[in-house]
């Protein structure tokens, strides 16, 4: 059975780390579903111009919870997130964005985001 107690904590924790150690790079990893819990914190990172890089795993939903439904042979309910554009949301908060669709694109995208300074989302598009 999966556990979802930590949904949404990546971005707020990254903001705290960036405030505590501004000289160090901060990289947060989040799924698209969990990120939606605290998406408004993007404004905090922008206001403080924190060099946070958010790597967003975009599978258009709550994949672990979706799998729990499947494992229990139960109908899926409330686990698919398909009505948002994460990059448009991030840009609306003043973040730079980039998209990764192939494994070989990830390392260069993260390196470029870290080098750019300021808040940046690297969206990894994966099958739902």
Annotate each predicted stretch with a short phrase.
Residues 1-128:
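Thiamine diphosphate
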């Amino acid at each position: 059975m999966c556990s979802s107690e930590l949904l949404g904590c990546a971005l707020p924790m990254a903001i705290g780390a960036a405030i505590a150690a501004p000289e160090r790079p901060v990289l947060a990893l989040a799924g698209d579903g969990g990120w939606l819990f605290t998406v408004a914190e993007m404004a905090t990172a922008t206001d403080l111009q924190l060099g946070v890089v958010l790597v967003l795993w975009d599978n258009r939903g709550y994949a672990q919870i979706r799998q729990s439904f499947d494992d229990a042979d139960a109908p899926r309910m409330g686990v698919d997130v398909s009505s948002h554009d994460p990059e448009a949301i991030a840009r609306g908060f003043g973040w730079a964005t980039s998209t990764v669709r192939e494994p070989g694109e990830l390392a260069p995208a993260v390196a470029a985001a870290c080098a750019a300074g300021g808040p940046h989302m690297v969206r990894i598009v994966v099958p739902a």
